[in-house]
Regions:
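One-carbon transfer enzymes
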Residues: 1-198
């Protein structure tokens, strides 16, 4: 299976996916390209170190969002991937891309959907919401991407009791953090052979 990984930041989840492929936890999978909207994202360096094509496609480089959306989809299509993994990608996915890649784009959201999800809940903002509400159980949700925000069909969820919560990490009773959960969820999905409906 050929995958593209889209990421906006440091790429700790990307690195965990790379490592899982390298050590055989994830099999029959190859990362064709890593795409970031941020030229300074360390994820691009991680990809290069692993011998993976690294590309920056930033909305700021285009005259309009429509022009960005068109080029983003064109470049993604050029890699002929089977699956797109959003690993902390802070860009709204273009509707045409969702249509072309229906049930082939997955996102791992750092909460148990339907809690702390939707517009405004991303990255540390999710953890701020968890902290403010004082919840005792949190986790991560792997879901297909649709036209809504965190509304696609849920594939897997991983939960645990919150024992320490800071704005940098959510440590769960199971010993996992969001950074650990994402590649594990991807690995489980790929290893359990979830079929992609095209």
């Amino acid at each position: 299976m050929k995958i593209a990984v889209c990421v906006s930041g440091g790429g700790t989840n990307l690195q965990a996916i790379i490592d899982a492929i390298d050590n055989g936890t994830i099999t029959n999978t190859q990362i064709e390209v890593v795409i970031s909207n941020n030229a300074d994202a360390y994820a691009l360096e991680r990809a290069k170190k692993a011998g993976i094509k690294a590309v920056c496609i930033s909305p700021k480089s285009y005259e309009s969002r429509a022009a960005f959306n068109e080029d983003f989809l064109k470049q993604l299509n050029s890699y002929h991937v089977d699956l797109v993994v959003l690993a902390g990608f802070l860009v709204v996915i273009p509707p045409e891309m969702i249509k072309q890649y229906r049930n082939r784009i997955i996102n791992i959201h750092p909460s148990l959907i339907p809690s702390f999800c939707g517009t405004g809940y991303y990255g540390l903002k999710v953890h701020e919401g968890v902290l403010a509400r004082g919840v005792k159980v949190t986790g991560a949700t792997c879901h297909f991407v649709d036209e809504g925000t965190d509304t696609g069909p849920i594939i897997l969820q991983n939960s645990g009791l919150v024992i320490i919560l800071t704005l940098l990490n959510v440590y769960l009773f199971s010993g996992d953090s969001h950074r650990c959960s994402q590649p594990r969820q991807c690995a489980l999905m790929l290893l359990h052979g979830i079929r992609i409906a095209v």
